[in-house]
A protein has these predicted regions:
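Membrane-embedded alpha-helical bundles of multi-pass transporters/translocases
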Residues: 2-464
């Protein structure tokens, strides 16, 4: 059995992974802090914010597939995905600052409009282009499955490391920058500049494979000719794509619920800085799990069993967090939070490699290369799951009687915070575990190859020739 060809050096993998520093200065800041910034600093209504975010999500499903298709049809000296990754983040930086720079002298309607425009452009246009392109690079810079897993692990180590720092220090950082609206604006500017620099370094650290290595002229013609409708059919007929998309949406919805921790720490635990403490107990175990994921995947000859069993651990962990939370036992909450995060880590590390396997499944069944649009599930999940999660948080807070101008919240609001932060994450983990138990795309690909009487190397050669 011939050894699988390698394409990347260690610094390529690290450089690629650093790109999620940029992605998470946007994502972590939005999901963890935008709602509490709008309600407690600007003084806007949580329910109205929730409705605006929900309306904004209408645009997202369309733009994900559009940008995925555009990436597949792009041919430049830089490659297919890198131009979109580079230029997309310029817009991300500008609109991120806009979201956290709402003028205090505007009336309420103008403030809501300002937020809606900046938020929609950030999510539906610029973050979409950047994130899909960044994710698609996994399939465009290497054909080695182990390297893809390693890229995913490096990526999410940087992602969770960035999330940890942002969640741990942002409240204090805002105060250090003067507090209030000016403090939030200054912090957003600093985060945006950091993201812009790191995103550029990441994009320039890897080189996309040539067209000759990816496909021959006949295949390239096929790729550029499929229509939007055909691309949509390819996706919806790939059951594994649909599973990953739903899973990713649920994960990001989960993240939005965990983001309620800003309110939970401030109004239930009476110490907003406890949000940063919980961030440590979430992100450090995630990073530890990511470090060991490539080794375990290699030892177990695949990703399916690891993903399924580790998420079972995560589900048990979140159940115990809920029990400890209602007991009021913070040390136990922290311990079980760490256990849940440890179980969630492997899927975060090998998810991009699973998506690449889904893309291979489409090629084996439909004979179409759709690498760019296949990775639309990542951006789609981030925006629909995270966005709608944030929207629902706002609506539920408003429904419960929460008001950002109050120092002490009513019992109904406190009860709602318990439900959102303790019960909902457990339920979401339970559903994700069930989906992962059905997501054995590696086995499906192997069975198709066996039926066709071709080897792994022949599949790669066929996809390249």
């Amino acid at each position: 059995m011939s050894k699988e060809k390698t394409y990347l050096k260690w610094y390529n993998k690290v450089g690629y992974g650093s790109g999620d520093v940029a992605g998470n200065v946007v994502y972590a800041l939005l999901t963890s802090f935008v709602m509490i910034y709008l309600t407690d600093t600007i003084g806007l209504n949580a329910g109205v914010i929730g409705v605006l975010i929900a309306v904004s999500k209408i645009f997202d499903g369309v733009t994900d597939i559009i940008f995925g298709t555009l990436i597949d049809k792009t041919h430049t000296k830089m490659g297919k995905a890198k131009p979109w990754m580079l230029y997309g983040f310029i817009g991300c930086a500008i609109t991120l600052i806009g979201v956290f720079a709402i003028p205090m002298n505007m009336d309420d309607f103008a403030q809501y409009a300002w937020f809606f425009i900046c938020y929609t452009l950030l999510n539906s246009v610029f973050y979409t282009a950047n994130n899909i392109a960044y994710s698609a690079l996994t399939a465009l810079v290497t054909r080695n499955s182990k390297e893809r897993v390693q890229m995913g692990s490096y990526r999410f180590i940087f992602a969770f490391g960035t999330s940890l720092l942002i969640q741990a220090v942002t409240f204090q950082f805002v105060e250090a920058m003067g507090g209030g609206a000016n403090g939030w604006r200054t912090v957003a500017i600093i985060y945006a500049v950091i993201g812009l620099i790191v995103n550029t370094i990441s994009a320039l650290s890897v080189k996309e494979l040539s067209d000759e290595e990816l496909a021959d002229s006949e295949t390239k013609t096929e790729e550029t000719k499929y229509s939007f409708g055909e691309a949509f059919k390819i996706l919806v007929h790939n059951k594994y794509y649909m599973m990953i998309t739903v899973t990713y949406i649920l994960q990001q919805f989960y993240g939005a619920m965990i983001g309620v921790g800003t309110y939970y720490a401030k109004y239930v635990l009476a110490n907003e800085n406890m949000f940063g403490t919980f961030a440590w107990f979430i992100n450090i175990p995630l990073i530890i799990a990511l470090i060991f994921t490539p080794t375990i995947v290699q030892k177990w000859n695949g990703m399916y069993k690891l993903n399924k069993y580790s998420y079972m651990v995560a589900t048990v962990g979140r159940l115990l967090v809920a029990v400890a939370g209602y007991m009021g036992n913070i040390p136990l909450m922290l311990a079980f939070t760490a256990l849940a995060a440890l179980g969630q880590g492997p899927w975060q590390g090998d998810m991009n490699a699973v998506i690449a396997s889904c893309s291979e499944y489409s090629w084996l069944t439909k004979h179409k290369h759709v690498d760019g649009i296949m990775y639309s599930c990542t951006s789609l999940g981030v925006k629909i799951g995270g966005g709608l999660g944030t929207a629902i948080v706002g609506l539920l807070l408003d429904f419960s009687g929460f008001k950002g101008t109050l120092t002490v919240q009513p019992d109904s609001a406190i009860n709602m915070l318990h439900i959102m932060y303790l019960i909902v994450p457990f339920a979401l983990d339970l559903i994700i575990t069930f989906i992962l138990s059905k997501m054995n795309v590696e086995k499906a690909n192997a069975e198709i190859k066996e039926k066709l009487g071709i080897s792994e190397n022949e599949v790669v050669m066929e996809s390249q020739n």
